[in-house]
Amino acid sequence: MNKKKNAPVRKIIADNRKARFNFEILNNLEAGLVLQGAEVKSLRSNHANIAESYASFENGELWLVNSYIPEYTQANRFNHEPRRLRKLLLSKREMARFFNATSREGMTLVPLKLYFNERGRVKLEIALARGKKLHDKRETEKKRDWGREKARLLKRYG
């Protein structure tokens, strides 16, 4: 008999749910990260926080700023700094496109997910985003509440 192929496994380490509420997501992209060994071991134990982080350009390179990967407890003197800058790996074309987009006013690069891909490599899903105004956030909340209410009504009477 034919064996079914399993869907690719993406083990999510950290998810930035706040970004989807605070920003209007325009374009997503997967980027690699330059990490040290102790950082990867710490990530394998699902410890990371990217909620307050962002990506910025310095000297033609893209860096992840303010991400938190705690020190690995079994590592000794070779441990890493938890809030250090981490280089993002993108092709030159993608980097140029993002650089041009972020140079426009109101655009920023926000990390959405940190995960292990099918090959066991740590990847970061970053998005080109524009900040939402307060009234936009309220409108999004109203739409979400109405969707939930609609689902309840359909379940009860439908």
Curated annotation (Swiss-Prot):
GO molecular-function term, one example from the UniProt record: RNA binding
Key word Cytoplasm present: yes
InterPro entries named among the record's database cross-references: SmpB, SsrA-bd_prot, SsrA-bd_prot_CS
Primary localisation category: cytoplasm
Keywords in alphabetical order: Cytoplasm, RNA-binding
Gene Ontology BP term (one): trans-translation
Keyword hit for Metal-binding: no
GO cellular component: cytosol
Origin superkingdom: Bacteria
Compartment(s) of residence: Cytoplasm
Chain ranges passing through the membrane: none
Functional description taken from the UniProt entry: Required for rescue of stalled ribosomes mediated by trans-translation. Binds to transfer-messenger RNA (tmRNA), required for stable association of tmRNA with ribosomes. tmRNA and SmpB together mimic tRNA shape, replacing the anticodon stem-loop with SmpB. tmRNA is encoded by the ssrA gene; the 2 termini fold to resemble tRNA(Ala) and it encodes a 'tag peptide', a short internal open reading frame. During trans-translation Ala-aminoacylated tmRNA acts like a tRNA, entering the A-site of stalled ribosomes, displacing the stalled mRNA.
Family: Belongs to the SmpB family.
Name of the protein: SsrA-binding protein
Species this chain originates from: Bartonella tribocorum (strain CIP 105476 / IBS 506)
Biological classification of the source: Bacteria, Pseudomonadati, Pseudomonadota, Alphaproteobacteria, Hyphomicrobiales
Gene symbol of the encoding locus: smpB
